[in-house]
Every structure is written in structure tokens, then in C-alpha cells.
A protein has these predicted regions:
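Short beta-strand edge/turn micro-motifs at domain boundaries
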Residues: 1-11, 124-151
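Short, low-complexity N-terminal intrinsically disordered segments enriched in polar/charged residues
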Residues: 1-46, 50
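Short beta-strand segments enriched in hydrophobic/aromatic residues
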Residues: 52, 112-116, 145
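Hydrophobic pocket/interface hotspot
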Residues: 36, 47-49, 56, 68, ...
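Surface-exposed, charged secondary-structure patches
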Residues: 75-119
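Sec-exported extracytoplasmic/periplasmic mature domains
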Residues: 37-42, 50-57, 61, 77-85
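Acidic helix-start/capping segments at beta-turn-to-alpha-helix junctions
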Residues: 52, 63-68, 90-99
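A short gly/proline-enriched turn/hairpin at secondary-structure junctions
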Residues: 18-23, 57-67, 82
Length: 151
């Protein structure tokens, strides 16, 4: 009998040191993310809100916490009024891992270039987003950032 066992592509380590395998995740989350990024580029707050889970949490690189979809939409509304951020997706990896309660978590890890204007000057940053999906909605995003290399 041949068992259909997912191939591990990495390891997740919890805060208390518990290890679990990271395996290939649900590829459908890629199209959800593409719709989400397009909505950001189009300043379509209604679509963004429809993809956010009600209990959305965002962890931007500056150390703040965006708690709840309504707070996320308020944050974006102000940002979009003050600037014109644009994201270009460079790569996406669908992956999943089991949490300490034994629940399978669906993640999408993505690489984006963010072009924005700061004090009238255009900047480009590299972002990595770790995105947690629950029931087709985005429940949490961790954003990591570095300045784009000048070569």
C-alpha cells in the first residue's frame, strides 16, 4: 500500500521549541493574494475588507500591531490618502504547518517590491509577507522589510 505523505519542505519551530514539518500548502491562496495585492494597488478598500478576516492582525516592520479588519482599513485609507504605494509581487510559496493544538495552518510566503513616496522622494523596499489564511480569508500578515539594494 502506497501512502500519500506530503514531502516536508522545512521545519516550523514554535516559541516553546516544538518542531513540526512545513509542507506544500493550498495553491488557491495564491489567487486570493493576487486579488488582495491588486486591490491594494487600486486602493479598493471594499475588496481588501472582503478578504480580511474580521479578527485580522497585521504586524508591520515598524513594530506596531494592526488589530482587526476595520483598523486595517482605517490605516490603509490614511496611507492611500497621503501617498501612492504600489506593490509588485516577485514570488509566492504556499505552505502549511500544524500548530501546537494539531490544527493545520495554511500560509503563503511572498516577496514584493513596494514603491512609495516618502517626503516627496520615491523609494523602493523589498517586503516579505508571511500570510496566514483561514477559510479563504487573510487572518494575519507578518511583514519584513529591507531597503532595495542599489547595484
Amino acid at each position: 500500500k502506497i501512502e500519500d505523505v506530503p514531502t516536508a519542505i522545512g521545519i516550523q519551530i514554535t516559541n516553546d521549541g516544538v518542531r513540526s514539518s512545513i509542507v506544500l500548502g493550498e495553491m488557491e491562496n495564491i489567487s486570493v493574494w493576487e486579488k488582495y495585492i491588486k486591490a491594494h494597488n487600486d486602493k479598493d478598500l471594499e475588496t481588501i475588507a472582503s478578504i480580511d478576516a474580521i479578527d485580522f492582525k497585521g504586524y508591520p516592520p515598524n513594530g506596531t500591531v494592526i488589530d482587526g479588519s476595520e483598523t486595517h482599513i482605517s490605516f490603509l485609507k490614511k496611507w492611500f490618502a497621503d501617498s501612492n504605494p504600489q506593490w509588485t509581487t516577485r514570488w509566492m510559496i504556499a505552505n502549511s504547518a500544524t500548530d501546537k493544538e494539531g490544527v493545520e495552518q495554511q500560509w503563503l510566503t511572498t516577496g514584493q517590491e513596494l514603491t512609495d513616496s516618502v517626503e516627496g522622494e520615491q523609494i523602493t523596499l523589498n517586503h516579505i509577507h508571511d500570510v496566514l489564511f483561514v477559510d479563504g480569508k487573510i487572518k494575519m500578515i507578518n511583514v519584513y522589510e529591507r531597503a532595495k539594494a542599489i547595484e
